[in-house]
Amino acid sequence: LGMNVVPEIDVPAHANSFTKIWPELMVKGRVSPINSNRPLIDHLDVSKPETIAKIKEIFDDYTKGDDPTFDSDTTVHIGADEFLYNYTAYRKFINEIVPYIKDTNTVRMWGGLTWINDHKTEITKDAIENVEMNLWSKDWADGLQMYNMGYKLINTIDDYGYMVPNGSYGRANAYGDLLNISRVFDSFEPNKVRSSGGYQAVPSGDDQMLGAAFAIWSDNIDKSASGLTESDLYWRFFDAMPFYAEKTWAATGK
């Protein structure tokens, strides 16, 4: 079909599925600096060597062996976004885990290195070269900064491309029930990345500019569940898909 599934195992944040099983690896006694009502119980404490060893073991289960679940042609997404504890440990973790997984697979991650910055721990070349990054927020990952660092970029900026089914547009044009497809058609350009100085163009066709994507986040769950079905989600996907296709697929097929 010409489509490749990119599996994501999200670490070290958004990792409730792991901290429930291994609570000893959880960040304990800390709350989000953004929301004091949110304890960081979904964060793996990557300042502990045993945590990093467990994360490697998890990825090894999928990427290594005689018949790995994720073969060498599979791009593996490691998440790596919205970590809100011990930025030095996080950046050291990125410097260790990305080259480790690169031994078997292409690595993709969500942008977070602008926000998660201790201003002393540099990200190494091995954790940048040929690594793919979804740009989703200028605050978490300044697009121009990530380009200059050398990451391969996928423009997934929330300002144009984030929808939350049955959402209420927490910000103008983003996080609502549907994308603003008129705005996407009129003004979205995949090679214009969002940075602290506004939208900045990187060269069209640049090897570092892989394209663009939009995201459907089914955040309204549990007590906020709206009763939407998979068919409802598909309709929302199909509403936006041709407009992103128009913007990202050139006549050359690139």
Predicted regions and their residues:
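Loop/turn elements at helix/coil->beta-strand transitions in domains of secreted/extracellular proteins
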Residues: 2-4, 71-74, 102-107, 128-130, ...
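Short glycine/threonine-rich loop-to-helix capping motif typified by GTGT followed
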Residues: 82-93, 119-131
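A structural signal for short, well-ordered beta-strand segments and their strand-loop junctions
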Residues: 6-8, 77-79, 108-109, 154-156, ...
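Active-site-proximal loop/turn and secondary-structure-junction residues that shape catalytic pockets
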Residues: 9-15, 82-84, 113-115, 137-139, ...
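Substrate-binding cleft of carbohydrate-active enzyme catalytic domains
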Residues: 1-104
